């Protein structure tokens, strides 16, 4: 009898909890009136590469992981050292460590260091890189997100106007659609490639609808000992090796996203 009472209380509690989450996500959440977008207009074409210094191209990756949730500190330390060593051996100038919901300060001694983390922890992979982050935002929605949900999360991350927001792996689990990119705004970059695939089909609706968004390419590496997971997608940035200069270059498009096809390679030596 007591077991049945406990079971019933648990089920009622679970039902109320899920109902609360549904209300917060779909009823209480901010509602936007998205204006109908239009293509870029004007007499001139913006050229981010105008007056660049060809001696200042730096190679960078901002999306790589050294930890999963609840990983012990010693394991994280070993993974961080290994990640740094691998990228340095391949000639990278800027090495970003974007752990989930955690800022890794391993590279803080470098003038180019930009605190970054991957935001988002729900099943549907609506994730963003937050560059120049001062703190972690735990706002997220557990169920499939509406366009309003997606915009609200971006706006909350962008409350600190010094941050740079990058939407990553939009195709994973159908997190975002080309329709979403017709209307979404207030972010800086789209990660157009990672170690697994390209996401270029999402960039056309961004530009076609007049959104000033630039591209990035990053490994999104999780298995550093797997050659196919590291050093195949990166950014060439025209910048000084100083944080503010790097951020300005990314925000103004003074960079090139690069994706190598290494599917046939089997070893690091290749």
Go through the PLM ranges and name each one:
Residues 107, 133, 207-210, 266-270:
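Solvent-exposed, non-transmembrane amphipathic alpha-helical segments
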Residues 25-168, 177, 183-185, 192-205, ...:
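A metal-dependent hydrolase metal-coordination microenvironment
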Residues 1-53, 221-270:
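C-terminal functional module detector
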Residues 162, 211, 254-255:
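Residue-level recognition of short, well-ordered coil/turn positions
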Residues 111, 184-190, 210-214, 231-234:
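Glycine-enriched alpha-helix->loop->beta-strand junction motifs that scaffold or abut catalytic
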Residues 112, 127-129, 189, 233-238, ...:
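Generic structural signal for residues positioned in beta-strands
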